[in-house]
Amino acid sequence: MNILLATMLAATMHTPGVVIDDSPTRVQTDIKIDMEIMGTLRPKSVSEISSSRWTLDCGGMDREHADWRAVRGYVAPLGIARIRQQAGWARCEKDPGMYDFAWLDQCVLDAKRMGVDVWMELSYGNPAYEGGGGRHLNAGFPSSEEGLAAWDRWVQAIAEHYKGVVIDWCIWNEPNGKTSGNTIEQATDFAVRTAEILRSIIPNARIAAFALTKA
């Protein structure tokens, strides 16, 4: 299935290459700099480097704040070897039991085709279920029996879909936000149940429990 999707994406996502300006005049400014220009840094693409510390945050596409097509042409040429993506449960499962990964595949499979790894964040919640958690920043975890059961099914579905494609996972974004209402006990239980599902499907999964915040 993933091979077919990747083939389709290679055809439908083709766009002319982005020209990265590395000339000495690439930055135009009225600021007077009393120094001699010694040279210009030329970015190296993903194919020219063995490793990179750069990670591009794509978390926001799940709530349609951004579009992968607007940035895709710059990622690999600038040497960005990994992207962080929020899976967007509420966007992938708008109707209970019906998963649509098309929008996420557009980003994930295209990135992999370019040699860019994906770090997948599973949050947020899904208001399609009573007690399914919020779908926004500082959202609360799924809390009801129905919501937690639906979350378990969601984790299983996305893990099965991206098995062999995504190894790096994160469970929830900023669960300790001041308005989230999440407790340490909830966070611990939630992390364990989610990690157990991921590892049952992807034994070599690398799992980060949470991305925390001071806000």
Language-model features: locations:
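Compositionally biased, proline/threonine/alanine/serine-rich low-complexity intrinsically disordered stretches
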Residues: 15-18, 147
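Threonine-centered tandem repeat motifs in low-complexity domains
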Residues: 7-8, 12-13, 20
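Substrate-binding cleft and catalytic face of glycoside hydrolase catalytic domains
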Residues: 75-215
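Generic secretory/membrane-interface signal
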Residues: 15-16, 24, 115, 168
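Sec-dependent signal peptide recognition
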Residues: 1-7
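Boundary/entry segment of secreted carbohydrate-active catalytic domains
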Residues: 17-81, 86
